[in-house]
Amino acid sequence: MKPKKSLGQHFLSDAGILGRIADAVGISPGETVLEIGPGRGDLTRQLLHRGARVVAIEKDTGLAAELMGEGRGKREEGNVTVIEGDALRVDWHSVVASTLPSSRFPPPRFSVVGNIPYNITSPLLEKALTPPLPRVIVFLVQKEVADRIASPPGSRIYGALSVGIQAACRVEKLFTVKAGAFRPSPKVDSAVIRLTPLAQPLVPVEQAGAFRRFVVACFSQRRKQLRNAVAGAVGREPAVVADALRALGFDPTLRPERLAPADFARLLIWSDQL
């Protein structure tokens, strides 16, 4: 089937690259892997060959039918469940649980993997990082986005996206995939990122939304000094904020991009005490 531009489809069929993506998940035999946008099933086969039980969510009606019917999934001893639907709307945990035998114990954590359409990368990342978190997330995304996610403090591309994800996960940018590997070729290169949720995230689950809003506000005018950026985020006078920052051990004249994710977590705790 031809890729649909409306769905942002760019098919990847290079077995070597797909194998590296599947290896990055670190699959244990029998582990459930949720695949976002399986397309023609090329990555699906690689996951199956490594012993995964695959739950695949496919929005394209034709591709979903192919995978459910005479497509590649049915030839793998029933270890594929295809869900036709929008991955942004489907309840991932419910569909995974529905494929498991009934048990009085909570279902084990699953992994998430996918070749992600560029136009829905941000909301998919947000959904993937909504608790309860997967064991690991491996996404093929636009290289520019991968660079931003993995960028360290002080980098010109370090920002709210970097802080938000690094506060919850260990981030690894694994390798680049050139545009020419896809059909049709996108205009830019892609990269594979692996996000491993931290055993102890920097911010408690119940404060994740507040943390995200606070960090976005601090970076909304990234050239401002820290005292002004934080003052705008918490609604206080810059002079008052500057004194508080000094008391916390921060230089109020720094730019927000100089702070590590743990520093933003400390500032959020301070702001809650105002």
Give the positions of each predicted feature.
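Catalytic cores of RNA-modifying enzymes
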Residues: 1-101, 105-217, 246, 257, ...
